[in-house]
Amino acid sequence: MNSEFRAPTAVERVFNRIFGFLVGLGLGFSYNYLLQVRGRKSGRLFSTPINLLELRGKRFLVAPRGRTQWVRNAEAAGEVTLKKGRTQQRFRLQSIPDENKPEILKAYLDNFKREVQRYFPLQAGSPVQAFDELAQNYPAFELIAV
């Protein structure tokens, strides 16, 4: 798996904080959640807003920026909490192998193109086979309720 990631700009960091605060209050679309995970070194609780993909009755997290800090922390912790308003749920992470990611990546881009298109070299609506070569650049996890 590729270890690089695209760091957020200063504007994106400010937007993520504001949007994360709103999602934490329970606002946002049905797929918006605040992901909470313990830092792998500090043990501190970190939060970031995410788009949760539901596909064939399963829940998936995709990291459109690559191996970000939340990805590294989540892999180390083995579990995350999704929060929206007063509702919280813990999940165990199951990493998706690269060969199984194309369908998930396509669905993610097609569903959330307005928010994530800039992180993908393909256009939303591209055929699933076009995602084969990209799979290693985008960590993806199935969420399993704890």
Go through each PLM region and give its residues.
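Short, structured beta-strand-loop surface elements
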Residues: 58, 65-146
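Short beta-strand segments
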Residues: 30-64
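Alpha-helical membrane-targeting segments
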Residues: 1-32, 117-126, 133-135
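Short low-complexity stretches enriched in small and charged residues
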Residues: 4-19, 44-50, 61, 96-101
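A generic structural signal for ordered alpha-helices
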Residues: 1, 13, 21, 28-30, ...
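Short, functional N-terminal and low-complexity linear motifs
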Residues: 2-3, 37-42, 70-76
